[in-house]
Amino acid sequence: MTQPVERLPFAVAERVRWSDCDPLGIIFYGSFVRMFEAAEHEMFRAAGLPYEVMRVQRHVQLPRKAFAVEFHSPAQMDELLDIQVGVAKIGTTSLTFRFEVYRSGDGAPLHRASATLTVVCVDKESITKRPLPDFVKEALAPFVIGA
């Protein structure tokens, strides 16, 4: 098991449910995608930019471009996970998020997974990339790693 790295700027708690597990009772890898998305959405909400407001009222579309995950140790059913997220990079048209997942609760935290996700800002009509609006960059500034 790897030791905890620095704590990322935002976190949500997620419990591993029966529906998250494979027949061995450990978390199915695809379940992490839902948890990462929940952490991402809640970070945007904490920044004052709920996804639905960004999408509908502010016309900011952020489809996924790249996703990579590394599993360090298996999470098990009913485990409480600390899903941490921070903004690793703000580009001209893209954002890259970093995620770290640890088992919460008693004892030393166990590092369960690490991931990165890159999203690209696109025009709603043409689905072509466009510059990331300044208000998004400003709202996410407190969540930038190392800032």
Can you name each region flagged by the protein language model?
Residues 22-24, 72, 84, 102, ...:
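Intrinsically disordered, low-complexity regions of eukaryotic proteins
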Residues 22-26, 42, 60, 75, ...:
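Flexible, active-site-adjacent loop/turn segments at secondary-structure boundaries
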Residues 14-18, 71, 121:
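Hydrophobic residues in beta-strands and at strand termini
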Residues 32-35, 63, 118:
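Residue-level recognition of specific faces of alpha-helices
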Residues 1-49:
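Catalytic strand-loop segment that frames the active site of acyl-thioester-processing enzymes
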Residues 2-12, 76-80, 88-147:
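HotDog/MaoC-like acyl-thioester-processing domains
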Residues 43-95, 112-113:
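Hydrophobic beta-strand-centered segment that forms part of the acyl-chain substrate-binding groove
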